[in-house]
């Protein structure tokens, strides 16, 4: 008996061709979490017309008093859009080309992830794994949006370790034979996007075959000889770890109300996502920086020195062979290093200090920002930042295989504007 594939074709819903891409698509909800003005500009760009902005809850609003009303409005918009806006569909995958501002073209395949083949539980080794530690307190707010929702729309980006370019790139080579389902410029400097429906049974079989090969024991043992014989890893979460975890948590909650037969086919068992090849030149793995608010830069530096002394971490000024980073405030920036770090990665050592500091300064708040210019701007407004060193993408899968998960928010795939924009939808409430 063939096992259920971990990534498979879906009944994907799309808006009317009359709705411009620049109005319809908006960036992932977990971006610009300290920049309310960005989301106000997004609302202006949508111009009151149908937009995926109406189907999501930007995290900048998570702590607002009206969050329940916002979620109710989202669910109402989903019902309306299902009837009146999502008038087209593709049965299969969507092959996507995203042209970034730099001119690089990022290729991907949108399909559905089997949540039964994924777990964020510590120590679990399913075919699909998170790339970072899952903070369970971040799941309930996202579950509140998904619970009872008619639709999902994905910003999750999965990664395949496919150096031979067997999964996605061959589909791109045949795009002229495919039905184009959308194309246009994305709002607010998001670049250009185009999508083609992949519905030909021969192409679907080709994708399935390539995925099976990537997830085979033979391929796993060849790629990761240090872990030979271990449970194969087919896909890793690149962006959207907590969104996929929330979908999983909602599914586990719903499963309890379903018969075994219903569990095999209920659409909420799956979650839409885009799969990309980590080896693509268009995939950049960048560090995520830490920014503290409501703190004084000098006080943070003194606390850091005291913490380092108590943990024998060997902090020093200047760039050392071990873990280097930049501590930046409103008026000054210093390169510092740990000569005897307490964690394998710089980000892990910094996170250990931040946890210590936050426990002693209840007024402090921390945010995680991908873009260095955005970090510098926050520093000019009074923030204190820990700027992380570069992250080597070649170590991503090895880190997951050998070490489980990376520290929370270790890396980001590209700048904020390059994140996945919501484009496709899928019904998760009833039969597809």
PLM segments and residue spans:
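Active-site beta-strand/loop microenvironment that shapes enzyme catalytic pockets
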Residues: 213-258, 263
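Structural beta-strand/beta-sheet cores of well-ordered domains, especially the beta-sheet scaffolds
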Residues: 51-53, 154-156, 233, 268-274, ...
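Charged substrate- and nucleic-acid-binding regions of tRNA-handling and nucleotidyl-transfer enzymes
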Residues: 348-432
């Amino acid at each position: 008996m063939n096992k259920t594939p971990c990534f498979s074709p879906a009944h994907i819903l799309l808006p009317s061709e009359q709705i411009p891409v620049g109005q319809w698509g908006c960036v992932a909800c977990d971006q610009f979490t300290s920049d309310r003005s960005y989301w106000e500009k997004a609302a202006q760009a949508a111009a009151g017309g149908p937009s995926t902005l109406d189907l999501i809850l930007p995290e900048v609003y998570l702590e607002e008093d009206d969050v329940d009303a916002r979620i109710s409005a989202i669910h109402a918009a989903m019902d309306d859009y299902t009837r009146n806006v999502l008038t087209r569909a593709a049965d299969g995958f969507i092959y996507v080309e995203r042209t970034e501002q730099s001119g690089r073209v990022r290729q991907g395949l949108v399909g559905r992830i089997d949540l039964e083949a994924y777990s964020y539980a510590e120590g679990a080794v399913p075919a699909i794994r998170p790339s970072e530690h899952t903070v369970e307190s971040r799941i309930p707010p996202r579950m509140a949006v998904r619970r009872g929702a008619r639709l999902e729309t994905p910003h999750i980006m999965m990664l395949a370790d496919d150096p031979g370019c067997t999964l996605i790139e061959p589909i791109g080579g045949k795009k002229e034979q495919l039905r184009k389902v959308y194309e246009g410029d994305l709002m607010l400097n998001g670049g250009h996007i185009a999508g083609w429906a992949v519905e030909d049974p021969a192409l679907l079989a080709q994708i399935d075959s390539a995925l099976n090969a990537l997830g085979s024991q033979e391929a796993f043992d060849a790629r990761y000889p240090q872990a030979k014989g271990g449970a194969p890893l087919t896909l890793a979460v690149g962006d959207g770890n907590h969104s996929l975890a929330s979908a999983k948590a909602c599914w586990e909650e719903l499963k309890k109300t379903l018969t075994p037969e219903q569990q095999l086919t209920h659409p909420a068992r799956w979650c839409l996502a885009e799969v990309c090849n980590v080896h693509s030149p268009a995939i950049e793995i960048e560090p995520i920086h830490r920014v503290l608010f409501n703190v004084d830069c000098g006080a943070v530096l003194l606390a850091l020195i005291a913490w380092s002394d108590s943990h024998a971490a060997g902090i020093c000024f200047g760039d050392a062979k071990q873990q280097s980073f930049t501590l930046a405030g409103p008026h000054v920036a210093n390169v510092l290093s740990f000569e005897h770090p307490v964690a394998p990665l710089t980000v892990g050592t910094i996170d250990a200090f931040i946890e210590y500091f936050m426990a002693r300064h209840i007024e402090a708040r921390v945010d995680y920002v991908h873009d260095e210019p955005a970090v510098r701007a926050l520093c000019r407004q009074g923030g204190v930042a820990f700027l992380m060193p570069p992250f080597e993408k070649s170590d991503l899968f090895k880190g997951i295989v050998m070490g489980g998960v990376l520290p929370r928010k270790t890396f980001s795939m590209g700048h904020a504007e390059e994140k996945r924009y919501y484009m496709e939808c899928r019904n998760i409430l009833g039969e597809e």
